[in-house]
Regions:
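Short alpha-helical oligomerization interface
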Residues: 24-28
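Phosphate- and divalent-cation-binding pockets in alpha/beta enzyme and binding domains
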Residues: 18, 64-65, 110, 186, ...
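Conserved alpha/beta core of the MobA/IspD/sugar-nucleotide pyrophosphorylase nucleotidyltransferase superfamily
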Residues: 2-8, 159-160, 166-253
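Conserved beta-strand segments of alpha/beta enzyme cores
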Residues: 29, 53, 71, 155, ...
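Conserved N-terminal catalytic core of the sugar/cofactor nucleotidyltransferase
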Residues: 1-10, 18, 32, 36-100, ...
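A structural signal for short hydrophobic beta-strand segments in well-ordered beta-sheet cores
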Residues: 30, 148-150, 226
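The conserved acidic donor/metal-binding loop of glycosyltransferases
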Residues: 103-105
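Conserved core of the sugar-phosphate nucleotidyltransferase
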Residues: 68, 109-190
Length: 253
């Protein structure tokens, strides 16, 4: 199977300071679990779904990514910018249908298939079974969680804010999304407008998260569709994540 018309952009510029010493000599995405790196695990899932048109946007120790044989674009300002800025370092690649994925996550084939099945212009995977996973990573799940509210029609009405209670979290944002060409035009307009007007994202574009972009899209009445999944993914942010039995159990996707 070949998904030739779908490009995948991997945001792999991260330094992974909270994963030191494991990231002293490599990008965050190249940290290994059970003998295989996060990025290798992700590429394996993508390849099995026929997703071979991959672009990596690197930063920290960017040259190490060359071993994978894919196109690399460098965010030379990785140390002072955030996810959204990293994505737009590859603005020339934002055409047609594009999957955008963080580099510090791994997901199962069922997760990527659910995303591929969505016909929405902006589709975002969310973990409905997030709470038990978050409790295994944090004493208080609200410490590292963000709001995510979903309308009856399945579109997201709010994302990325600080929650006051668990009731404001109807799923966990995973860092995996898909845009149609129309959806890409919508986010490009938001991004370029935000450079001139800091109020659009609530912060300057250089320091904005992807969730800031998605929230701005929602505010401007663009449909952002939730793609619900139930577990079958991991995120590795800290040494504790890397070493936990939960991570090692869930990595058997």
């Amino acid at each position: 199977m070949q998904n030739k018309k779908i490009k995948v952009i991997l945001l792999v510029a991260g330094e992974g300071k909270r994963l030191r010493p494991y990231t002293l000599d490599r990008p965050k995405c190249m940290v290994e679990i059970e003998g295989k790196s996060l990025i290798e695990r992700q590429l394996e899932v993508l390849k099995n779904e026929g997703l071979n048109d991959v672009v990596m946007i690197g930063g920290y120790n960017c040259e190490m990514l060359k071993k994978y044989g894919y196109k690399i674009i460098e965010n030379s300002r990785y140390f002072e910018t955030n996810m959204l800025w990293t994505l737009f370092c590859a603005e020339g690649e934002l055409e047609g249908d594009v999957i955008v994925s963080y580099g510090d996550i791994v997901y199962s084939k069922r997760v990527i298939k659910a995303l591929l099945d969505s016909n929405s212009d902006i589709a975002v995977t969310i973990d409905k079974d997030w709470e038990s996973y978050w409790r295994s990573r944090n004493e208080d799940p609200l410490d590292d969680a963000e709001t995510l509210k979903i309308r009856k029609d399945g579109t997201i009405s709010e994302i990325g804010q600080k929650p006051k209670s668990l009731d404001e979290i109807e799923g966990q944002y995973m860092g995996l999304m898909k845009f149609s060409d129309r959806g890409l035009k919508q986010i490009k307009e938001i991004f370029h407008s935000s450079i001139k007007d800091i109020n659009i994202l609530g912060k300057d574009a250089e320091n904005a998260y992807m969730t800031d972009l998605l929230q701005a899209a929602i505010v401007q009445n663009n449909k952002v569709m939730a793609v619900p999944v139930f577990g079958e993914w991991i995120e590795v942010d800290t040494v504790s994540d890397l070493q936990s039995t939960t991570t090692k159990k869930r990595i058997q996707l």
